[in-house]
Amino acid sequence: MILHYAQSWEDTHLLKQIIGKHPAQYHHMIASGGDHAFSLVKFGVEHINLVDSEVIQLEHIQSKIKALEHPKREILFGINDVNNGLLHSGRLEKYLRKFSAILPLLLRPGARNSIIDCISKEERVRIIKEKWETKRLRLVSSLFFSKKNINDIRHPGLSSDISKSPSGVNYLENFKLKALQYPIKENPYLDYIIHGYHKNSSLDYLKKSWAPKTSSLTLIHQDFFSYVKKLKTAIHFIHASDIMEGTSSKFNDRLFQAVDEVSESNSTFLYWEHRYEINVPESFKKKWVQINMNVI
């Protein structure tokens, strides 16, 4: 089974639904910032291998694990601090905080508070139409989240190959779509974009003083392709995140093949198709079934 979805960050609600419907024997993920893995372990996944070619990413996750067990975890994560903490140290987060700082100038008065207080979808539709539909927001967001700027703030390894066709993602329209779909209090990622920190929400793994068991996460310093190639055949859950956006089509074909070779029936392969279109080999399409995102 294959899945791709266009999100800038991990959509943990979606991942939980997928794992709940399509259980696997083994779980493997690009390490990234670790937030997605923490959420899934808290959700009930017993063990996840987190793989990354960058030592700094693995060290960042280790720091988060230690912070989760610390009595001053809120300070270490920067839960109520827009400038300091483990939640704010990424390149993307720093860029989003710049946008959140100027956002009030682009909206009609009271726009941010109004959308936060909305409970029903009907209310959010009305508020976005009345207070968020401004020429200033459309202009500045198109410049701020231009293809060039997004490529510049991504990790260098994720923008090394830009020969693929751009996906034409419209960040503002995606933002509105997600704002309409869920209340801000239930969507920490939109809350972060609006305020520069989780002002009205919280990441699920940061609730109720939770910390992962020592045995639940294994951090592996290795490139993802080499790692996948060495897996034993089984029912796998393999999450490649957005690494294929920064690699050539030829390399991506090899990764698809490697995933296919180690995966038994009912395995799941996930990847982001965010900034660039990822071409799936015909041989892969014949063996795998694409998940219909509308029925997850």
List PLM regions with ranges.
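S-adenosyl-L-methionine
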Residues: 1-23, 144
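A short acidic, Gly/Pro-enriched loop at the edge of an enzyme's catalytic core
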Residues: 24, 222-239
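Conserved acidic E/D residue at the C-terminus of a beta-strand in Rossmann-like folds
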Residues: 50-55
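Conserved beta-strand signature within the Rossmann-like core of class I S-adenosyl-L-methionine
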Residues: 239, 265-277
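A short glycine-rich, Lys/Arg-flanked "PGG" loop and its adjoining helix->strand segment in the class I
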Residues: 251-267
